[in-house]
Amino acid sequence: MKKVMATGTFDLLHPGHGIYLNEAKKLGGEDAKLYVVIARDSTVEKRKRYPIVGEQQRLELIKMIKGVDEAYLGNENGDFLKIVEEINPDIIAIGADQRHDITKLQKAINKRGLKAKVERVKAYHNAELDSSCKIIKKIKKMDFKGKINDNCD
C-alpha cells in the first residue's frame, strides 16, 4: 500500500479539486491511501488572499470527499516538510495548476532524508469556474437584483 499526499487550500470547492484528489490517489496504484493536507488560514493569507471558508470548515469538507482516507491541517510555522515527515508518504502529488518547483521540492525532501517522490498530476478540469479566484470574480460581478434572502446572516 502506497501513501499519497496531496496539498491545497481547497477554498470554495469546485470540480477541479475533486479531479486533483482522484488523480493524486491514482498515482499510488489500486490500494493507495490518500492523505490530504489543507493549508492554514495564515498560510493562505500570506500566499494568496484571505480565505472565504475557514480552515476547520475546509478540513471538514475534504474529509467528506470520497477517496480521501485522512485529512489534516498543515503546519502554521511554514515548515511544509514537518507534515511530510509525520505522514511519511511515498508520493507527494502536485496539482496541474499548482505553482511548485518540483525539482526544488524533491531536493529539499531528499536533503531531509525522506523517501517521498514528487509527481505532478496531469489532469486538469478546464471549465468556466475551475478556480476559487474565478468563482470570487464571478460573484463580485453578479447583480443579484435584490434576490438574496434577507434571512442570510
Swiss-Prot record:
Q: In which pathway does it act?
A: Cofactor biosynthesis; FAD biosynthesis; FAD from FMN: step 1/1
Known Gene3D superfamilies for this protein? Answer: HUPs (3.40.50.620)
Q: Can you tell me which residues bind ATP?
A: 9-10, 14-17, 97, 124
- EC number in record: 2.7.7.2
Q: Which domain of life is it from?
A: Archaea
Q: Name one GO biological process term.
A: FMN metabolic process
Reaction it catalyzes: FMN + ATP + H(+) = FAD + diphosphate
Query: Which cofactors are named for this entry?
Result: a divalent metal cation
Keywords for this protein:
ATP-binding, FAD, Flavoprotein, FMN, Nucleotide-binding, Nucleotidyltransferase, Transferase
Q: What are the protein's GO molecular function terms?
A: ATP binding; FMN adenylyltransferase activity
Q: Which HAMAP family match?
A: FAD_synth_arch
Q: How does it assemble?
A: Homodimer.
The role this protein plays is:
Catalyzes the transfer of the AMP portion of ATP to flavin mononucleotide (FMN) to produce flavin adenine dinucleotide (FAD) coenzyme.
What family does this belong to?
Belongs to the archaeal FAD synthase family.
Matching entries from PANTHER family are given as: FAD SYNTHASE
Protein name (database record): FAD synthase
Q: Organism source for this protein?
A: Methanobrevibacter smithii (strain ATCC 35061 / DSM 861 / OCM 144 / PS)
Q: Which gene encodes it?
A: ribL
